[in-house]
Every structure is written in C-alpha cells, then in structure tokens.
C-alpha cells in the first residue's frame, strides 16, 4: 500500500500504481472476518482498517482514465462492481474489454475471465 501511494506521489500519471491501490482496497474488503483477525494478529493489522470499497472504485477508475486500453484495469473494476452488486456498471467494463487489443501476455486470459463473468451475471439486477 505505502509503495503504491509513494509511486502516485512521485508520478500522478502512473496507471499501474492506481491499479495497485484500487486492487489492494478491494482485496482487503474481500477478506473474511477470520482472515482479517489472523492478519491483524500476525501483522498488527492497522493498515487493514484503510481498506474500503469507495477507494477501490476510485483508484481503479483513475487507472482506466489514465490507460483506457488496459484490459486488466477494466477487469478488476468490473469485479469490484460485481462484489458491490452494481451489475450494470460491471457489464459496462466487461463489455468494453472485448474489442480492446491484446497488449499483455495475460490479456487473452483476462478477456476470457471477463466473458465468463459477464455470462455469470446475465440477468442480475443492480442491488444498489
């Protein structure tokens, strides 16, 4: 977390740093109560209290604004939207992935994941 924030402070246009921070927030929020308890016991865990869904969305959206062709940025934000029951917004991200060119060795896999999740949430209505 600290390194990602430091990277943003040094270069406010570093899309990867914004992705890192947004993904960190999402992963902290996805931890179970037991996992959070274990992490707090083992590592002190004060840093876990920083995690929140709003920042996950904000930082990942900023990564996309900086590099809209990045498939992984869109996949990660779409997954956050699914976690939050914002299926319409998730569909927007997953649908936007399909026409994007492959630029990373994992982009083909990311496209497949997006297509699978899009199929999984077919017919889901927004919860919020």
Predicted regions and their residues:
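Extended serine/threonine-enriched, polar tracts that run as long, contiguous segments within proteins
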Residues: 63, 71-73, 78
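Alpha-helical linker/edge segments of TPR/alpha-solenoid repeat scaffolds
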Residues: 28-36, 86, 117-128
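Short coil/linker segments at helix-helix boundaries
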Residues: 1-13, 21-62, 102-109
């Amino acid at each position: 977390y600290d390194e990602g924030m430091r990277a943003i402070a040094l270069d406010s246009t570093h899309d990867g740093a914004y992705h890192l921070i947004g993904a960190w927030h999402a992963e902290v929020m996805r931890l179970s109560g037991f996992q959070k308890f274990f992490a707090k016991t083992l590592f002190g865990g004060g840093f876990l209290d920083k995690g929140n869904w709003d920042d996950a969305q904000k930082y990942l959206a900023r990564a996309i604004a900086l590099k809209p062709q990045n498939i992984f940025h869109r996949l990660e934000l779409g997954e956050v939207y699914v976690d939050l029951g914002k299926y319409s917004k998730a569909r927007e991200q997953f649908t936007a992935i399909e026409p994007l060119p492959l630029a990373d060795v994992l982009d083909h896999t990311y496209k497949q994941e997006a297509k699978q999740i899009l199929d999984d949430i077919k017919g889901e209505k927004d919860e919020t």
